[in-house]
A protein has these predicted regions:
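Helix-turn-helix repeat elements of alpha-solenoid scaffolds
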Residues: 4-9, 176-178, 267, 309-312
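Short, small/polar-rich motifs associated with maturation and membrane association
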Residues: 55-56, 108
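Terminal amphipathic helices with adjacent charged low-complexity linkers/tails
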Residues: 221-227
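Outer-membrane beta-barrel channel domains
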Residues: 261, 265-269, 273-277
């Protein structure tokens, strides 16, 4: 058996470097920035054009490493709309290949279990941008998405998008220039960004002179390891929470962790609710419940904080943000986990979250979530949240995990992914601890696989996090791998 690596030291190093390229570049955001030009038509960010040139797939599409249809659709629409502004032969050839892909694959997304964020806003917007550029796109095949767009915008009070923060900030590039300008007046952050979104920030530059927004994008460009632009920036609180949780769950206490725990306590003590970044004005249930769960596992009394989660309670589930079109399995599982520190007091809320999660179960065994493409991510968080309070929901999950493990010890797409394998191990450990699994042989097989991938570089991780396009959060993948290896060691 491979000897266990120094996982505590690796966790300490990870926590000390969280501010280094927290998320990968992706096509969607890079395309919006590639389209920015000066008055002479010269691109403001030529490195973004180069990134698009070198990240088109052989079939003409753009998007993540794994062929997730909705990601390929939105990413390809964004790329061809942006590149259609340029006359270079390579750009024209790339656009034509992208258009051909869209005609050949415009229906693929309908059978996919995934949708990207703001999908119902992005597709109509990008189709319109392509039409204005003279591209021959299969727009008539997406009329039902236009109806979803109308329905989503109809749920928003007329005054809300400009007078108070809303989730539209994150996708502000998809709203009218007039609404974007009103949002910028109130919600553009001191660092120049809006909505933690490079694409939305690029829209501020596109629709008018905004030196602060351009300076923000230039700072991102200077830090980019490959010339592309990330899905989210800044996103420091989200990254901190999701990096800490597996480490704390595994019982690791690396050097420096107390400082990070204090950061979460300070946020909750000050506001009661948590956002994904100090620059983002809208708190959410996911980051809030995550912070509470981490602190509870680390020994903090979170009882005074828990009532704040009731802000997100609805008739039949808990929402992450107001005005969402649908709920999230992982968010409801996380809220149930947070409330499980006071299971008697919050029994109705745990039951409500469990009921929603039960309705989303697939084949009686596993789940998908809107924020991540892997069923192992969603299923792991259900196991974390409900194995101790609602074990009946998970009675067949261990069998599903056993049956879907690959011969090489991994789980997941394309014959196995380190991130998916780590979440499968974390899920199985939770089931074992709850008495819902007894066969630990999958854990020993996974251990060798994860050891082999412990030192993978950032570009070797597939994009599985779900934004308007898919992206990778390498620190979170490594945190899950380190923690899974630490827990698996106990079963060797």
């Amino acid at each position: 058996m491979i000897p266990p690596p120094d996982l505590t030291q690796r966790a300490a190093h990870l926590l000390a470097t969280l501010d280094s390229n927290p998320t990968s570049s992706n096509t969607y955001n890079t395309a919006f920035i590639a389209g920015l030009r000066d008055v002479a038509g010269t691109p403001l960010f030529p490195q973004a054009l180069d990134w698009l040139r070198h990240h088109q797939h052989a079939d003409g599409s753009w998007g993540g490493t794994l062929p997730v249809p909705v990601d390929r659709l939105v990413s390809t629409l964004a790329a061809v709309a942006s590149l259609s502004q340029y006359d270079e032969p390579w750009a024209k050839s790339a656009v034509q290949a992208g258009v051909d892909y869209l005609w050949g694959h415009s229906e693929d997304w309908r059978t996919s279990p995934h949708q990207t964020s703001a999908f119902e806003l992005a597709v109509p917007y990008l189709l319109d941008q392509g039409r204005r550029a003279g591209l021959n796109l299969p727009a008539e095949r997406f009329t039902d998405i236009e109806q979803l767009r109308t329905a989503k915008l109809g749920r928003l009070p007329a005054v809300l998008p400009s007078e108070a923060p809303s989730p539209l900030l994150y996708s502000a590039e998809l709203v009218s220039p007039q609404l974007l300008a009103r949002q910028a007046e109130r919600f553009q952050a001191e660092d120049g960004s809006i909505g933690c979104s490079p694409a939305a920030t690029a829209a501020l530059c596109h629709h008018g002179d905004n030196p602060a927004a351009e300076r923000f994008l230039r700072r991102l460009a200077a830090r980019s390891p490959d010339g592309g632009f990330p899905e989210l920036a800044p996103i420091e609180i989200f990254i901190l929470g999701w990096a800490l949780y597996p480490i704390v769950r595994a019982g690791l206490r690396p050097v420096g962790i107390d400082r990070h725990l204090a950061t979460l306590r300070d946020i909750l003590d000050t506001d009661g609710l948590v956002t994904m970044s100090a620059t983002f004005p809208l708190p959410d249930a996911d980051d809030t419940a995550m912070a509470m769960t981490i602190l509870h596992r680390a020994g903090t009394d979170v009882t005074p904080y828990l009532p704040h989660l009731l802000t997100f309670e609805r008739d039949s589930y808990f929402t992450c943000y107001e005005f969402e079109r649908d709920g999230s399995v992982a968010v409801n599982a996380r809220i149930a986990e947070a409330f499980s520190s006071e299971p008697q007091r919050y029994a109705p809320q745990i039951e409500k979250a469990a009921g929603y999660i039960a309705d989303q179960r697939i084949d009686g065994a596993y789940w998908y979530d809107k924020w991540h493409t892997s069923p192992y991510y969603a299923t792991a968080h259900v196991a974390f949240g409900l194995a101790s309070t609602t074990p009946k929901l998970l009675e067949t999950t261990a069998q599903w995990l056993r049956e879907t493990q690959h011969p090489n010890g991994s789980w997941g797409a394309a014959q196995g992914q380190p991130e998916e394998t780590a979440y499968a191990v974390l899920a199985l450990d939770a089931l074992v601890q709850a008495g819902l699994a007894t066969d630990i042989s999958p854990l020993t097989r996974a251990y060798a696989y994860l050891c082999h991938h412990l030192d993978d570089n950032d570009t070797q991780y597939a994009e599985m996090w779900n934004g308007r396009g898919l992206f990778t959060a390498p620190h979170l993948t490594r945190s899950a791998i380190i923690s899974a290896l630490h827990l698996a060691t106990a079963y060797l």
